[in-house]
Amino acid sequence: MAKKVDGYIKLQVAAGAANPSPPVGPALGQKGVNIMEFCKAFNARTEKFDKGMPIPVVITVYTDRSFTFETKTPPASFLLLKAAGLKSGSGRPNTDKVGTIKRSAVQEIAETKAADMTGADMDAMMRSIEGTARSMGLVVED
């Protein structure tokens, strides 16, 4: 018989840096999940990522307090800032441009995010990433 799902928890945790402090501890504690077990498993699974890279994770909690989790690809905004070599985007993206990014870098990011994105094809996914770049104050050039 399949386990009964008690709920889902969506978090964004730094790769290799999951610990019982907020936001991880309180979110898992509410559902009665073993916090240290999750932290060890998450840190082991995210070893391949750069330390500190934000990784979205969806935790499925079952009624017997066991859990499974699925990691996603890092947010497009983080990947764009990393590719452009910036710390943050523009507070006023329509007037203040903070940097430029090449279309080839946008394509690499779209390929990285392809598993998590629902775009019909690569061109649509690239346009979505370009829109994110523009909303951050980045100029996309060929």
UniProtKB/Swiss-Prot annotation:
Keyword Ribosomal protein: yes
Superkingdom field: Bacteria
Pfam families assigned to the protein according to its UniProt record, in alphabetical order: Ribosomal_L11, Ribosomal_L11_N
Single GO cellular component term: cytosolic large ribosomal subunit
Gene Ontology molecular-function annotations: large ribosomal subunit rRNA binding; structural constituent of ribosome
Keywords: Methylation, Ribonucleoprotein, Ribosomal protein, RNA-binding, rRNA-binding
Gene Ontology biological process terms from the UniProt entry: translation
Cited Gene3D superfamilies: Ribosomal protein L11, C-terminal domain, Ribosomal protein L11/L12, N-terminal domain
InterPro entries for the chain: Ribosomal_uL11, Ribosomal_uL11_bac-typ, Ribosomal_uL11_C, Ribosomal_uL11_C_sf, Ribosomal_uL11_CS, Ribosomal_uL11_N, Ribosomal_uL11_N_sf
Entry comment on modification after translation: One or more lysine residues are methylated.
Subunit structure: Part of the ribosomal stalk of the 50S ribosomal subunit. Interacts with L10 and the large rRNA to form the base of the stalk. L10 forms an elongated spine to which L12 dimers bind in a sequential fashion forming a multimeric L10(L12)X complex.
UniProt xrefs under HAMAP family: Ribosomal_uL11
NCBIfam families: L11_bact
Family: Belongs to the universal ribosomal protein uL11 family.
Function (record text): Forms part of the ribosomal stalk which helps the ribosome interact with GTP-bound translation factors.
UniProt-recorded name of the protein: Large ribosomal subunit protein uL11
Protein's gene: rplK
